[in-house]
Amino acid sequence: MKRICSIYKSPRKNEMYLYVLKAEGLERVPEALLPFFGTPVHAFDLVLSPERKLAREDIVKVLDNLENQGYHLQMPPAEDEYIEHLPEELLRRNDPV
């Protein structure tokens, strides 16, 4: 089953995205979610199918959420996934002696 999806980014939280069916728009998104998410900013439209791979989301879960609840919320990655931790000697390299 192929679905045309609109993806919106959050102006409040970096790397948080809201997937909705393009034909329905934001009508099934709960009002309680919008203060947390912020005013959705349209990022792009995408054709989704079970064969398609997504970078950080399970396509089957996304399609299921779109069918059953009318939206899918992609949360930002956990901090450990995108922050590089530097070795202690590099952190102290510019400290005064």
From Swiss-Prot:
Disulfide bonds: none annotated. SUPFAM superfamilies: YcgL-like. Residues 3-87 form the YcgL domain. Coiled coil: none annotated. Pfam families: YcgL. PANTHER family: PROTEIN YCGL. This is YcgL domain-containing protein PputW619_3899. It comes from Pseudomonas putida (strain W619). The lineage of its organism: Bacteria, Pseudomonadati, Pseudomonadota, Gammaproteobacteria, Pseudomonadales.
